[in-house]
Amino acid sequence: MPALRQTPCVAAALVLLLAALAAAAAEEDTVKRGEYLVRAGGCCSCHTAPGGQKLAGGRALKTPFGTFYSPNITPDPKTGIGRWTDAQFQRALRQGVSPEGTNYFPVFPYPSFTRITDSDALAIKVYLFSLPAVHQENRPHDVAFPFSWRLLQTGWKLLFFSPGPFEPKPDRSAVYNRGAYLVTALAHCGECHTPRNLLGATRSGQQLAGTPDGPDGELVPNITPDPATGIGKWDKEDVVEFLRTGMTPEQSRVKGAMREVVEDGLKYLSEDDLEAITDYLLAQPAIVRSVTRRK
């Protein structure tokens, strides 16, 4: 009889064990998915200083408005994001607002990240919180007045920020919409490949047309399908190969920031996602715009 009385206890213990194993497996899957999304988003390229620890920040980004330094996004509770709640993380990513309620400068690409889905945003957070915490103080930005005035960002948002999730086009294929999500939200390609106005907002009607004023003063090429000034002479295989390896059809290897984007992120993406990005890019309006260094 004692053995019979123990049977329900054993069964309950097995149920709890199986539930715990299932939860652990689900957590591991979320971490892996979050790592993939971080790769796609190019987070390591911006949030890791040369010779520094992964995602601990401190990388300088020179712009026409001054020099910005990326923050520590490891789970350190004092100098990183270790105390952030899910809601605070999503608000930062998708609204450009810190846990303290201040606006981030749009050098942080929240105008694109606003389109990221809830599930992707939380998977990114789960992955970041699985990493070792690095105690490294954030370096203050070196930005001239009036651009250094945080309150000015409120007006900037009213003029140029359109918050809201990604909305797939019902008349387009699933592949196109996946590519649109990757390009316009997660990988935020337009943040570097689109020219900006005097206030630092991307120019409407010039999406992906390139700019001579890229990060650190780099020339950022036109990636619309214009055959003369963009990638219009590239076929689908050319684009996929470039995204995977950084090699152009002319057999020259990409340099600068884009090399890091490929090495730290794009080369890890699935073939399906690389093809989706390609499908979207080649379906965009061709814009005639030669990108040359300013004299």
What is the predicted function of each stretch?
Residues 136-154, 293:
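Extended, well-folded interaction surfaces typified by the phenylalanyl-tRNA synthetase beta subunit core
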